[in-house]
């Protein structure tokens, strides 16, 4: 089990760090009182491997509970619960700027000067910082750069290589464009098998429709161009820290052309080793509604 304790200065990026760990599959808990760490770790270890990655945020917001941190870390060590500490730091100047922009009050300076609260927190956390396994100074980092750093430290090789999840979704424009789509492609320019009586009953999951739709020159050219575009976009999305990409392909009813193209794109992405899923949102909508309204 990998047990990460995330701590550090207020405003240094702990929230972004815990979100990044959550994206890596860690079971995350924010602001857990240190007095509960032992019981929490024990409960996780008793899941027989169902929970194998844990991340806890423990910071100065815990008030007097924070003073019990070292005693509880000692208890974890005595019980052979292996843990590592990630400490988020930033310069006073950057922390002041971030607090001014967010218009939040510092937990140790609710009624006093911000810089005094930062200095007090830095002194109180000095010993924790000394014990940290990893220290990340976020002073000159963007959120994406911090996420990248977290992924490199706490993600495994497979996660780093295949961190982008691609969802290929077919849909019918008559039923609305998917609200979560990142890329939308309209394939209504392709010949429509709906108007071929002997094909109308089938869907893009059937060979009859696939042979018809994929048999046209325009279809082959479109798939090749879309494949080439995704080949360019995917590594750039990964570079920017994107973890999910929804590629939506639409035709009129979402049963024939869009399903066929979505299947073809899904197969190509799968062959290239991408982490990809597919969904045909509206494939049965026309049938459920008793036929298509023109």
UniProtKB/Swiss-Prot annotation:
- Cited function: Displays ATPase and GTPase activities.
Chain residues that bind ATP: 8-15
What residue intervals traverse the membrane? Answer: none
Q: What is the lineage of its organism?
A: Bacteria, Bacillati, Bacillota, Clostridia, Eubacteriales
**What is this protein identified as?**
Nucleotide-binding protein NT01CX_1284
Q: Which UniProt keywords apply?
A: ATP-binding, GTP-binding, Nucleotide-binding
Q: Which PANTHER family match?
A: RNASE ADAPTER PROTEIN RAPZ (PTHR30448:SF0)
Family named by the database record: Belongs to the RapZ-like family.
Q: For binding GTP, which residues are annotated in this chain's numbering?
A: 59-62
User: Which molecular function terms from Gene Ontology are attached?
Assistant: ATP binding; GTP binding
């Amino acid at each position: 089990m990998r047990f990460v304790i995330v701590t550090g200065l207020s405003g240094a990026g702990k929230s972004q760090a815990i979100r990044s760990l959550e994206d890596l599959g860690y079971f995350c808990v924010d602001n857990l009182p240190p007095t509960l760490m032992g019981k929490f770790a024990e409960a996780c270890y008793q899941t027989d491997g169902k929970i194998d990655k844990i991340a806890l945020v423990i910071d100065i917001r815990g008030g007097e509970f924070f003073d019990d941190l070292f005693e509880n870390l000692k208890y974890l060590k005595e019980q052979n619960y292996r843990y590592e500490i990630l400490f988020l730091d930033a310069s006073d100047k950057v922390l002041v700027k971030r607090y001014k922009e967010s218009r939040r009050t510092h937990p140790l300076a609710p009624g006093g000067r911000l810089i005094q609260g930062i200095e007090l927190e830095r002194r109180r956390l000095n010993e924790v910082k000394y014990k940290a396994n990893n220290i990340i100074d976020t002073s000159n980092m963007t959120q994406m750069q911090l996420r990248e750093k977290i992924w490199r430290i706490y993600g495994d090789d497979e996660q780093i290589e295949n961190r982008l999840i691609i969802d290929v979704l077919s849909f019918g424009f008559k039923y609305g464009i998917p609200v979560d789509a990142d890329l939308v492609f309209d394939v209504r320019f392709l010949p429509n098998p709906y108007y071929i009586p002997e094909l109308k009953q089938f869907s893009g999951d059937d060979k009859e429709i696939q042979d018809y739709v994929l048999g046209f020159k325009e279809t082959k050219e479109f798939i090749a161009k879309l494949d080439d575009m995704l080949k360019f976009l995917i590594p750039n999305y990964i570079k920017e820290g994107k973890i999910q990409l929804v590629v939506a392909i639409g035709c009129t009813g979402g049963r024939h052309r869009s399903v066929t193209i979505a299947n073809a794109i899904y197969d190509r992405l799968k062959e290239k080793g991408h982490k990809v899923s597919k969904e045909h949102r509206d494939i049965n909508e026309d049938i459920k509604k008793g036929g298509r309204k023109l």
